[in-house]
A protein has these predicted regions:
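Phosphate-handling DNA/RNA-contact segment within nucleic-acid enzymes
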Residues: 21, 27-134, 151
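Short, acidic/turn-prone active-site loops that include or flank metal/cofactor-
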Residues: 114-120, 142-143, 169-171
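Conserved phosphate-handling catalytic cores of large alpha/beta enzymes
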Residues: 158-163
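Short hydrophobic alpha-helical runs that function as membrane-insertion/retention elements
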Residues: 111-113, 136-139, 165-166
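Acidic beta-strand-to-loop metal/phosphate-binding motif
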Residues: 93, 134-146
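Mg2+-dependent endonuclease catalytic cores in nucleic-acid-processing enzymes, primarily RNase H-like
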Residues: 128, 145-157
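Electropositive nucleic-acid engagement tracts
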Residues: 1-32
Length: 176
């Protein structure tokens, strides 16, 4: 994989962050033409890859591509790294892969993604378990219609089980 792709640089990612997350541009195969993002389970085992089209994709291509059979509803991106961090601090939950990666690069290492704006029942269980030794969860979803709706649903479900804080972003369309 080519690790010095212009898209990664444009996103402001450092070579160290690109290496930490195993990011790279795929020139062949099912993820051809995409930035590849390895996805690990909570134990650090590789369970899949996401392919992100660099920039705005053509109309006939989705922005993200996941391998056939991969069920994102059962995984929480970056939980393997976030679980190793200091236990007393809250777990930050965001929507996207690059939200996690950018926050990680800025020093927020207790950050995970549900890989979309909709929290599944399985992801809810994983987050509750992962935050048992922390001071709750912080929801920081995109400031758009899907993000606000997903944040409200996640808040209602998670607040029954733990302390949840919400960090609304300052402007429409903003991402963490």
């Amino acid at each position: 994989l080519k690790t010095d792709h212009a898209y990664l640089t444009e996103r402001g990612l450092t070579p160290a962050t690109v290496a930490e997350f195993g990011l790279g541009f795929c020139a062949k195969g099912t993820m051809s033409g995409r930035i590849v993002i390895p996805i690990h389970n909570k134990d650090g085992e590789l369970v899949g890859y996401a392919g992100r089209w660099p920039g705005q994709p053509p109309e006939d291509r989705p922005k993200y591509k996941l391998p056939a059979g991969f069920r994102k509803s059962v995984e929480v991106f970056n939980l393997d790294r976030a679980s190793k961090e200091e236990k007393g601090l809250p777990l930050i939950v965001v929507e996207g892969f690059f939200d996690v990666i950018k926050l990680w690069q800025q020093g927020f290492h207790r950050v995970v993604s549900i890989m979309g704006s909709s929290l599944s029942a399985r992801q809810e269980e994983v987050l509750v378990e992962a935050s048992a030794e922390r001071s709750g969860i912080v929801l920081m979803f995109d400031e758009d219609n899907a993000g606000r709706a997903g944040r409200e649903k996640a808040l209602v479900r998670l607040a029954r089980r733990m302390f949840v804080r919400v960090v609304p972003l300052p402007q429409e369309g903003a991402q963490p």
